[in-house]
Each structure stands twice: as structure tokens, then as C-alpha cells.
């Protein structure tokens, strides 16, 4: 049976993937398995998935959702932005923090309920600081090294990441693009049925043949 290694985004939980009703493992983002069937990464998890693949992780397929290719300009500005959020995740009032986080334009008004008790706030702040896109090296120049099939997904209302997705599939040797019409950044949870169907279709189309018939 196909096993999906699913990497959630920032402020994500392993249970975020329960809706898929597929054989899914959702590891800690610091302990990504080095091999498997399909590697699925959303947002921050998508960036970490790309770096894992470029670092030699062995998977048959990959699905990247709402992920960027890295910050090539204005890195100091992005670092300052991430530090601002890190300070708030460490010390800010939770309700106001969640309201402001979900009000960011990329989310298109879609909010995911999050309870403070589910998180270590110092760990969230550390993730923002250590995994800032301004610190991780940009990957565009190395995407040609990822030879496995890749499905890259973005929501049509998430203009920045649609542009990143289109650029990525031009650079990858074996990639498909799905723009989820009407969705913003959180495609899997805005359109769970369509997302799960597209994921199943991609995996099924890439399964190695098990036929023993003679040619």
C-alpha cells in the first residue's frame, strides 16, 4: 500500500492530514524519513521537503503545496518580519495573535482553529527564526536535480505562490501543475475533496507497473 509522508506547515498538526483517509505518516518536521513512497509537503513543510530531496532523501514521488523557492531579494526585510512574528508567538496574547495571523492576505480569509494548549510557543518562535525562507538557501537553481515525478499545487487566489509554482514546474524535469480554482494558500483544507482526489490521481498514475505479462 502506498504510504504518504506528509509534512504540515507552520502552526500545523499531524492531525491536519486526517481528512485524506489514506495511509499517512506525519513526522516531526525535524525528523523527516530519508526514504518512502510519496513525500507531501505544505508551505513550510513543502520547503523542507524540497531541501530533503536535494539532500538525498529517496522517494518515488513528491507533492509540493503552496511552497516558495526561497528568498532571493530583500532577505533582511523577511528576517525582520519573521522576528516580529516570533516575538508575538513567544509573548503575545493568543486570541489576538491567531486573529492577526489568519488575517494575512495569502490565507484569503480562511482560518484554521488552533488551541494554545496544542503547541510549545517557544518552539513555534524557534521555527520562525531558524526556518525563515531568508535563511534557507533558495532552491530554484537546483530543482533540475529532482528527477522524481512532482505534483506542484497552488490556489488560484494565492498569486505569489501561483507564480512560484509556475516557475518551479518549468525548472523541474518531471513535474505537473495543479492550480486549485478558488482556493488561497490553504488548498488542502479549503478544498479537501478536490485535493484528495487530485492526490490519489497523481499517485495512481505514477505507480510502477506490477504486470508480469510478456511483451
Which role does the model predict for each range below?
Residues 1-33:
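Conserved HGGG/HGGXW glycine-rich cap/lid loop of the alpha/beta-hydrolase fold
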Residues 41-45, 49:
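Gly/Ala-rich beta-loop-alpha elbow adjacent to hydrolase catalytic centers
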Residues 51-54, 58-90:
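Flexible "cap/lid" loop of the alpha/beta hydrolase fold
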Residues 73-77, 88-142:
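Conserved alpha/beta-hydrolase catalytic His-Asp/Glu region
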Residues 146, 152-154:
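Short beta-strand/loop motif that positions the catalytic acidic residue
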Residues 159-165:
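Conserved alpha/beta-hydrolase "acid-adjacent" motif
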Residues 170-186:
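Catalytic histidine neighborhood in serine/cysteine hydrolases
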Residues 183-192, 196:
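Catalytic histidine-centered segment of alpha/beta-hydrolase-like enzymes
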Amino acid at each position: 500500500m502506498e504510504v504518504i509522508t506528509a509534512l504540515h506547515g507552520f502552526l500545523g498538526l499531524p492531525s491536519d492530514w486526517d481528512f485524506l483517509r489514506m495511509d499517512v505518516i506525519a513526522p516531526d518536521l525535524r525528523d523527516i524519513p530519508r526514504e518512502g513512497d510519496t513525500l507531501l509537503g505544505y508551505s513550510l513543510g513543502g520547503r523542507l521537503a524540497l531541501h530533503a530531496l536535494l539532500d538525498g532523501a529517496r522517494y518515488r514521488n513528491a507533492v509540493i503545496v503552496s511552497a516558495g523557492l526561497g528568498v532571493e531579494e530583500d532577505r533582511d526585510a523577511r528576517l525582520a518580519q519573521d522576528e516580529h512574528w516570533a516575538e508575538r508567538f513567544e509573548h503575545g496574547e493568543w486570541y489576538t495573535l491567531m486573529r492577526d495571523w489568519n488575517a494575512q492576505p495569502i490565507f484569503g480569509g480562511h482560518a484554521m482553529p488552533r488551541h494554545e494548549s496544542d503547541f510549545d510557543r517557544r518552539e513555534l518562535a524557534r521555527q520562525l527564526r531558524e526556518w525563515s525562507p531568508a535563511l534557507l538557501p533558495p532552491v530554484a537553481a537546483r530543482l533540475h536535480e529532482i528527477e522524481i515525478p512532482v505534483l506542484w499545487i497552488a490556489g488560484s487566489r494565492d498569486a505569489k505562490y501561483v507564480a512560484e509554482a509556475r516557475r518551479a514546474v518549468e525548472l523541474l524535469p518531471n513535474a505537473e501543475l495543479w492550480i486549485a480554482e478558488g482556493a488561497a494558500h490553504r488548498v488542502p483544507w479549503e478544498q479537501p475533496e478536490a485535493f484528495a482526489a487530485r492526490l490519489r490521481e497523481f499517485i495512481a498514475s505514477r505507480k510502477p507497473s506490477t504486470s508480469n505479462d510478456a511483451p
